[in-house]
Regions:
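Glycine- and other small-residue-rich loops at beta-strand/loop junctions that grip anionic moieties
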Residues: 103
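A non-catalytic, amphipathic alpha-helix used as a structural packing/dimerization or gating element
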Residues: 1-4, 113-117
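Conserved small-domain helix->loop->beta segment predominantly found in fold-type I
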Residues: 1-46, 58-67, 86-89, 129-171
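Surface-exposed, low-hydrophobicity interaction/linker segments
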Residues: 51-55, 59-78
Length: 171
């Protein structure tokens, strides 16, 4: 599955795989998505993978420090500028990438689903930008006007099977 993802994503000009492409890999990928000459913010990519496909991914720099700077081509001057921006409350400007993984028990269908979801975001992610807002302080992207439930289910039974809970109460 790792080789399949690597082949598919390495051929896509909008997907930038980080790290040496010829090294042996476990099922974890670090990548960025391009839209034209610019990168989509890793936080937006993570939000799109979650909101559109239910895929959990992480965005950021993975506590990689100097290695992360090397992967992203960030020199000392840029690193200092980023540090000052983040300290000034602009966490959204923190450099980083998207990380996602393939578990050993994923079947081919799940593997293909993840591969194609990333390819979809690479092809169409920029079109969704107007539907999202970013909190500059936290760097978190959220769909604007997203509907949130007003109340949580009262019981686990209601959460897992609302119809069964209604039948038990006679409603």
């Amino acid at each position: 599955m790792v080789a399949r993802a690597m082949r598919a994503w390495a051929q896509d000009p909008n997907i930038e795989l980080l790290g040496p492409l010829d090294a042996e890999r476990i099922g974890v990928f670090a990548l960025n998505i391009r839209s034209g000459s610019k990168k989509l913010h890793y936080g937006l990519v993570v939000a799109l993978l979650n909101d559109l496909f239910g895929i959990q991914a992480r965005g950021g720099c993975s506590c990689a420090g100097p290695y992360g700077h090397a992967l992203l081509g960030i020199g000392d001057d840029d690193a200092l500028r980023h540090q000052q921006e983040v300290r000034g409350g602009q966490s959204v400007l923190r450099p980083g990438w998207v990380r996602l993984g393939f578990n050993y028990f994923f079947d081919e269908r799940t593997t293909d689903y993840i591969i194609e979801a990333v390819r979809f975001v690479a092809a169409h992610g920029a079109a969704f930008m107007s539907l999202y807002k970013v909190n500059p302080q936290s760097g978190v992207w959220a769909m604007s006007g997203a509907v949130r439930p007003k109340a949580r289910p009262a019981t686990l039974l209601e959460a897992l099977a609302p119809d069964a809970a209604l039948q038990q109460t006679g409603e």
